[in-house]
Amino acid sequence: MAASFLHGIETIETSTGPVPITVVKSSVIGLVGSAPLWAAVGAPAMWQPSWVVAAGQQLVDPNGNIQQCSTVGTTGTSAPAWSTTLNATTADGTAVWKLVTIAGTLLQAPTLVNFTANPNIAGSAAAYGPLIQGYTIPYALAAIQAQGAGQAIVVNVFNPDLHYTAITAQAMALPASGPQVLNLGHMGVWNVVVKNSGGSTTYINGTDYSLDPINGIVTQKAGGAITTGEALSVSFSYADPSKVQDSDVVGTVTGTMYTGIQALRTTYGTMGFFPKILIAPGYSQDPATAAALLSTAETVRAVALIDAPPSISPATAIANRGVAGNVFDTSSDRALLCYPQEQFSDLGLIPTGITLNSAGTPVQNAANATAVGPYSQWVAGTIAAKDLAQGYWWSPSNTQMTGLLGPDVTLYASVLDAASDVNNLNAQGIVTVFNAFGTGLRVWGNRSAAYPTVTTPNNFISVRRTMDVIEESVELAMLQFIDQPISNALISAILASVNAFIRSLIGRGALVAGSASYNPAENPSNQVAAGQLVFDIDVMPPPPAERLTFNVYIDSTLLSGLGDTNALTAVTLNA
């Protein structure tokens, strides 16, 4: 209260009592992988104006020449006319450039994706490009969306500035007759240089030929210098997702720059929430990638879904639980071990499969074949969808999945046989797939990798995730109490807030019981004098009904009712 002189009346408004606690998001997936941003709806051609650049590395222009700004702060004649941010310099005073965005989508920056069929809506999954073989993000987004999930935070690590293959002076020739079109044999091309067969003449894009960089097509231009049927020497680079390394996915922290999986740690500061289901399909079977997922999961209170390699037997998957250095050799209650990989109908484009029709028009050809993909992407979508439909306190187990054809190995599944493959896998903390007659393909397994080493209730996936939601929700809500004067009123307000939250969770079914309390014995005067308060929260989330047992008795005394006239009815038999 102000101590200054006042000849009048004042009103002091003070907020007291409990505050509402908001439940944090539980169903957001964190996805790290590779995406063909260059093929996304509305994406520019390689190295065009809307490909923003920043300091760090030289650019190569469409003719294969190194472009570098010679006059700091201006475009200069030797700098790309379409460059931006000309303010970074090297030791010699020149500005150099590095690709950082494509069509508005930041490389390495976590981006929130909402699953919508409209590719023109900001945050659409379509911004990460179509299904093209070799790129993991579009396939994962399709698997997630098929389960009905709502949102994902995506980190793309594919960068054509780094992940490409260069073709030098490849001998090619235009057709002797018909449409004068040259198929380079790869999608996503840039740095295309077309010369005559001897290499003495360099033809000019836009004058002598036109380029379709997405499909990798060079077309003769009327009036240009290229002649019908001419033999040519062509150099170019093409986007090559096979060049993405596990280290790219793991990422780094350099100053304020977070890349790969590490970038998921930054999302609370930019979006107000963390992803709670972490996947890196196609990469998580690598030990370093799995370790990065788990480390990040510990930091952001998430679960990390880790895949087994394709085509391994159930016995091998179980044995890997005890192989040092294997991704399945963990007892973390944040690790969900996903086995086996799954078959699905691959409708993705073949990046080397572009053909030309009789008019010389490029035709994109889809695989239209059965392929195998990481199980984690379907499990992640199932967890997120069940969170939205039922609640985060429900186990993902026994939930039917869509968009997949079945495991890549044969699994014996039965709820009646303890020796079945799926039961043996569950008994070792492995989440698998259940498929019996008429059941459909179902996520099967309630327990994290903590089981069987850890037998406390938090080895259940649903219990671990429920505790994460409760703990983080309470912590974030307590920010408004930080730095208030310690008093009985403050203690009462905190307890009332937390207990009201717990009661609401009990009412929803997220908790069986629980309460918050303040124990004076845990708060000695010297500790309180240091500004520190300790509260106890006792809660119990509902464990899943994993095993049902019926005690059945054959009771011969029930035969004593036979012959009772009250139990008999007249029956007329027809001849």
Task: Please state what every model-predicted region is.
Residues 1-62, 73, 77, 83-575:
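Surface-exposed assembly/interface segments
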Residues 67-71:
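Short beta-strand-centered aromatic/proline hotspots
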